[in-house]
Amino acid sequence: MIALIDYKAGNLNSVAKAFEKIGAINFIAKNPKDLQKADKLLLPGVGSFKEAMKNLKELGFIEALKEQVLVQKKPILGICLGMQLFLERGYEGGVCEGLGFIEGEVVKFEEDLNLKIPHMGWNELEILKQVPLYQGIDNKSDFYFVHSFYVKCKDEFVSAKAQYGHKFVASLQKDHIFATQFHPEKSQNLGLKLLENFIRL
């Protein structure tokens, strides 16, 4: 059973509908104790890094997530802002500490790239590692992105990249911690396939 963490940051309904399409049992976790009932966790999110961390703290999720993920070793998937929150720090609205599951930081796309920010729309993945999330998904497949910030971290955690002005991290894996900058729930059949792969872990 998958807990979708509700911390007032966005796209819960679309993620829940995607899981329903593939027959996956899920529920909305509105408080930290709810996480104990799940065997997998999902941290979605759209919006500001700083505001999201503030909400997680106020709702009591930060320590609960660290317990469930780092101690209990439950698999977790972070989507978009959810992925960014896994890093050590972000700079949106000033320097802000993240959850620290993965070493690295979250920075804004450079203004001098002459590109529209946010990066919005379909983009091709360069799959760098055959991790479980990409089982049955071909290299150069397209997924849907909406973001103004991107992750900088060690290559050892990067499972895919995409190109927007320069190459950026499209997905991460560190042991049982998985994350995508793109939105699988908005990426049609390939996105559903990725979510199925997460369920099967």
Swiss-Prot record:
Q: Which residues form the active site?
A: 80 (nucleophile), 183, 185
Q: Which GO terms describe its cellular component?
A: cytoplasm
Assembly and interaction partners: Heterodimer of HisH and HisF.
Q: What GO terms are given for molecular function?
A: glutaminase activity; imidazoleglycerol-phosphate synthase activity; lyase activity
**E.C. numbers:** 4.3.2.10, 3.5.1.2
SUPFAM superfamilies with a match to the protein in the record: Class I glutamine amidotransferase-like (SSF52317)
| Protein name per UniProt | Imidazole glycerol phosphate synthase subunit HisH 1
**Function of the molecule:** IGPS catalyzes the conversion of PRFAR and glutamine to IGP, AICAR and glutamate. The HisH subunit provides the glutamine amidotransferase activity that produces the ammonia necessary to HisF for the synthesis of IGP and AICAR.
The answer to whether UniProt assigns keyword Cytoplasm to this entry is yes
- Which keywords, in A-to-Z order, does the entry hold? Amino-acid biosynthesis, Cytoplasm, Glutamine amidotransferase, Histidine biosynthesis, Hydrolase, Lyase
Localization annotation: Cytoplasm
A Gene Ontology annotation in the biological process aspect, one of them, is: L-histidine biosynthetic process
Name the Pfam families on file: GATase
Residue intervals of the Glutamine amidotransferase type-1 domain: 1-201
Reaction(s) catalysed by this chain, per the record, are:
5-[(5-phospho-1-deoxy-D-ribulos-1-ylimino)methylamino]-1-(5-phospho-beta-D-ribosyl)imidazole-4-carboxamide + L-glutamine = D-erythro-1-(imidazol-4-yl)glycerol 3-phosphate + 5-amino-1-(5-phospho-beta-D-ribosyl)imidazole-4-carboxamide + L-glutamate + H(+); L-glutamine + H2O = L-glutamate + NH4(+)
The protein's matches in CDD domains, at most eight in alphabetical order, are given as: GATase1_IGP_Synthase (cd01748)
Identify the domain of life: Bacteria
Q: In which pathway does it act?
A: Amino-acid biosynthesis; L-histidine biosynthesis; L-histidine from 5-phospho-alpha-D-ribose 1-diphosphate: step 5/9
